Amino acid sequence: MTQPNPNKQSVEPNRTSLYWGLLLIFVLAVLFSNYFFN
């Protein structure tokens, strides 16, 4: 009963970090596309 609790707590920050990573990749892709097209 004690093991699932820390696992759930560790999953939440991993999801947030994953979303931040995707956001950074999206922003970098937009910046590079603007740089190359301009």
From Swiss-Prot:
Pfam families the UniProt entry points to: PsbL (PF02419)
Compartments it resides in: Plastid, Chloroplast thylakoid membrane
InterPro entries, per database record: PSII_PsbL (IPR003372), PSII_PsbL_sf (IPR037266)
Cellular compartments per GO CC: chloroplast thylakoid membrane; photosystem II reaction center
Topology with respect to the bilayer: Single-pass membrane protein
An individual GO BP term: photosynthesis
Top-level taxon: Eukaryota
Protein family (similarity comment): Belongs to the PsbL family.
Primary role: One of the components of the core complex of photosystem II (PSII). PSII is a light-driven water:plastoquinone oxidoreductase that uses light energy to abstract electrons from H(2)O, generating O(2) and a proton gradient subsequently used for ATP formation. It consists of a core antenna complex that captures photons, and an electron transfer chain that converts photonic excitation into a charge separation. This subunit is found at the monomer-monomer interface and is required for correct PSII assembly and/or dimerization.
HAMAP family: PSII_PsbL
The protein's assembly and partners: PSII is composed of 1 copy each of membrane proteins PsbA, PsbB, PsbC, PsbD, PsbE, PsbF, PsbH, PsbI, PsbJ, PsbK, PsbL, PsbM, PsbT, PsbX, PsbY, PsbZ, Psb30/Ycf12, at least 3 peripheral proteins of the oxygen-evolving complex and a large number of cofactors. It forms dimeric complexes.
Stated name of the protein: Photosystem II reaction center protein L
Species: Adiantum capillus-veneris
Taxonomic path: Eukaryota, Viridiplantae, Streptophyta, Embryophyta, Tracheophyta
GN (gene name): psbL
